[in-house]
Amino acid sequence: MKALSLFSITLSFVALTSVAQQRDFSKVEIKVVPVAKNISMLEGSGGNIGVSVGTDGILIVDDQFAPLAEKIEAALHQLNPGKLKFVLNTHHHGDHTGGNANFGAKDATIIAQSNVRKRLASDANSKKEALPVITFDQSASVYFNGEEIKLLHHGPGHTDGDSVIQFAGANVVHMGDLFFNGAFPFIDLKSGGSIDGYIKTVAEVLEKIPADAKVIPGHGKLGTVEDLKTFHAMLVETTGLVKKDIAAGKSLADLKAAGLPEKFKDYGTGFIKTDRWIETIYNSMQNK
């Protein structure tokens, strides 16, 4: 049952990604959301993109799906006519790295945690230009547009290659898929993700960032530190409830039948429904 449940989650995610890649991207509009100082967020289809513009040029965090590359370039040009110099990947999923090949072919330097390159390179369909050319294990810094931009790997969380991106001068943090604002997150257990690691990473970020920082989520609206705290509290409480029921000998079917408290209902209206979230926690616990 454990293997079947994990397979089902993985298969569902792959299927959803495939459908997304086949959709009509001509109808997608790229929206520019001002964040702070020279930092913006681009919303379109896929993971939110962080943007730094300035005298050094343009740096982006993630690049959504490949068919959106031209629209992303147009949005970037509206912000700054300079050259795109860097692409920072928060992890390897296609809705965050799909534009890599396009931007890499135009001489943007792609940087990511070591496991991101390994996972992208393991895909026979990956182009050389799509692969990160600079990788790191724990941390790296890019000094660009007058500030230090930190890439920090806290260990397994959403995947085994997550990076939290901190724009130190602008007081902005891009969480990648370590933050789904207002929704249950997808945790890729097959790619080294871990519910305990996910919670640990969010807690560590909250300990370090200023209370007035702006927080760019992987999915959802631009957030605040309070939003991230609320998200973390949800993670801790729902995981605790499932762990308690597992310890009491309840099955996955029992857990799904019981559900979660009503206050978490709205979290299950996104990609990950309540049953899927319970199953994710359950499978993560079984994998320990």
Where are these regions (language model features)?
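Metallo-beta-lactamase
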Residues: 29, 34-35, 57-58, 65-67, 115-161, 168-169, ...
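Conserved beta-strand hairpin/beta-sheet module of binuclear metal-dependent hydrolase folds
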Residues: 30-74, 165-167, 172-175
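Accessory terminal helices/loops
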Residues: 14-22, 207-208, 212, 221-288
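Bacterial N-terminal signal peptides
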Residues: 5-17
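Divalent metal-coordination and catalytic microenvironments
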Residues: 38, 52, 62, 76, ...
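Solvent-exposed loop/turn segments at secondary-structure junctions
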Residues: 45-49, 58-60, 65-68, 91-97, ...
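Active-site metal-binding motif and surrounding structural segment of the metallo-beta-lactamase
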Residues: 32, 55-59, 67-109
